[in-house]
Amino acid sequence: MFLHIGVDTVIKTEDIIGIFDLDTSTVSKHTRKYLNMAQKSGRVITVTDDLPKSFIVCTDEDDRSKKIIYLSQISSQTLLKRVGSIGENYLKRIKK
């Protein structure tokens, strides 16, 4: 299954490690340091020029030991609802 995270960007749901609210999670210095290191190593993809509201940590398809961080203008709550509805629809289909 795929999750639309903004503009023309979709990611595989099985690659998602976590979806985080940018405002609340960056209060921690550890999170800020992690995002800063990811940015410096070229592992951050900004989905839009709009102000980001969330970030999604995913495994890299080419190297599963590496992580990719997507910055999205869509709130973490909306993304989590989308993931939930994708999962519910999938379960309904396989139960038939």
Give the positions of each predicted feature.
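Eukaryotic intrinsically disordered, low-complexity regulatory linkers and tails enriched in Ser/Thr/Pro
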Residues: 1-96
